[in-house]
């Protein structure tokens, strides 16, 4: 199949592989001692209060938008790898499974003491203590949804939607994917003060 004919959507095997990788991540997180659900004992589909012990503990929150964008970006990267450069060593049906592997690896790292401590020390994390396994699994699901959306939608629609999500969360909670990465890698005190309402 030529590059123009490459399909980045998973077939049944690719979908099962993606699910299997996600399940493995859940098992690893449970083995790390992460709480299965919010320690509060309540499961909510949405929790919109950032300054709360339930943030990053429920199915979705303001940061779910960032995980959708992860999916957009991973699809874009897969598009470059398979369509432009060719990647004959690996069938494109595994692109989603590879994206889940990358996202899942981040979820494991994000819930490790070194990253939790980093968030608490350099970002406006309001006592961040890691995610519940439910939240991490949902984050992976949102990434997969973003990937599959980008695989079907026109590039311009995906780009506009991604920028819209970033601007919306910036307005709503003074945080987004770009600022999250900036503050984690290269913290800027002025940004931290602004995020705190200063």
UniProtKB/Swiss-Prot annotation:
Record carries keyword Glycosyltransferase: no
Residue spans crossing the bilayer: 13-33, 62-82, 96-116, 153-173, 177-197
UniProt keyword annotation of Cytoplasm present: no
UniProt keywords, alphabetically: Cell membrane, Membrane, Transmembrane, Transmembrane helix
Membrane topology qualifier: Multi-pass membrane protein
Record-linked InterPro entries: DUF2585 (IPR019691)
Pfam family, one: DUF2585
GO cellular component, one term: plasma membrane
Subcellular location: Cell membrane
Chief localization: membrane
Family under the similarity heading: Belongs to the UPF0314 family.
UniProt-recorded name of the protein: UPF0314 protein Saro_1818
Originating organism: Novosphingobium aromaticivorans (strain ATCC 700278 / DSM 12444 / CCUG 56034 / CIP 105152 / NBRC 16084 / F199)
